[in-house]
């Protein structure tokens, strides 16, 4: 099976690619520094493969990159796309872009599988680490269900080696945390001492987060915990 993986050198891709190769797939990485050097925001060479696993993402232009990728696909029988829980329920610009990517995949005519995942442990750590740089740490009143990139990678590899399944069950971490607990865990682990102050997230997005629209209480759950992740840093 010939598989092309976009973003195969990133946080998620570095776990997905070895899993696919271990399963016997012929894997080509398409990224700025991959087997095929390519910026999906520019001209994309023709992609001939059985399966495309689309993991590449950035701060801007994900919808454009996804449309460029889809236009370059030739004879692809299955496209696996990673998205984010809350893409259709949390009114933030970057999540609207993720939903636009999903819409483009669904309208492409290519058989597809879309997996929405929760925020990765890596991103959660970056967020709380950034907050902890302040002398007084603002703690948003929200809950998160962070998932380990390895758990998401395992699920994506299974999906890529299987048949197109459309939208599959969301995947989140094994536990739900209040943001204050995530911050407290990081401060304790890193030996930092900070005053924390609760803050209310404003607007419709804040309401969505307070309502748990970023969670997957009825979805699938990974096995690696936030505590294990922190201990390994």
Model-derived regions: residue spans:
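N-terminal Rossmann NAD(P)H-binding glycine-rich loop of SDR-like oxidoreductase domains
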Residues: 2-25
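Short-chain dehydrogenase/reductase
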Residues: 6, 63, 91-102, 142-150, ...
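SDR active-site strand-loop-helix element
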Residues: 6, 30, 55-56, 79-84, ...
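Mid/C-terminal beta-alpha module of Rossmann-like enzyme folds, strongest
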Residues: 10-11, 150-233
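NAD(P)H-binding glycine-rich loop region in Rossmannoid oxidoreductase-like domains
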Residues: 29-74, 84-93
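A short helix->loop->beta-strand "cap" motif at the edges of active sites that frequently abuts
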Residues: 74-78, 110
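Conserved beta-loop-beta element that borders a ligand/cofactor-binding pocket
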Residues: 83, 88, 102-123, 172
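A conserved pocket-lining segment of Rossmann-fold NAD(P)-dependent short-chain dehydrogenase/reductase
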Residues: 126-147, 151, 163
């Amino acid at each position: 099976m010939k598989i092309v993986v976009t973003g195969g050198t990133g946080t998620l891709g570095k776990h997905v690619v070895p899993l696919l190769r271990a399963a016997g797939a012929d894997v080509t990485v398409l990224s700025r520094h991959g087997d095929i050097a390519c910026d999906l925001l520019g001209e994309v060479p023709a992609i001939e493969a059985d399966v495309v696993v689309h993991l590449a993402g950035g701060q801007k232009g994900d919808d454009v990159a996804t449309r460029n990728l889809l236009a370059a696909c030739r004879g692809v029988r299955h496209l696996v796309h990673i998205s984010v829980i809350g893409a259709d329920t949390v009114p933030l610009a970057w999540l609207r872009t993720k939903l636009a990517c999903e819409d483009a995949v669904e309208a492409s005519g290519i058989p597809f599988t879309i997996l929405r995942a929760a925020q990765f442990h890596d991103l959660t750590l970056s967020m709380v680490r950034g907050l902890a740089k302040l002398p007084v740490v603002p703690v948003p009143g929200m809950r998160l269900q962070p998932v380990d990139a390895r758990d998401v990678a395992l699920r994506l590899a299974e999906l890529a080696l299987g048949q197109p399944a459309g939208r599959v069950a969301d995947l989140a971490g094994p536990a739900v945390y209040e943001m204050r607990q995530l911050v407290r865990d990081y401060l304790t682990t890193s030996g930092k001492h900070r005053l924390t102050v609760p803050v209310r997230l404003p607007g419709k997005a804040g309401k969505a987060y307070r309502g748990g629209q970023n969670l997957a209480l009825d979805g699938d759950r990974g096995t690696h915990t936030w505590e294990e992740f922190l201990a390994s840093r």
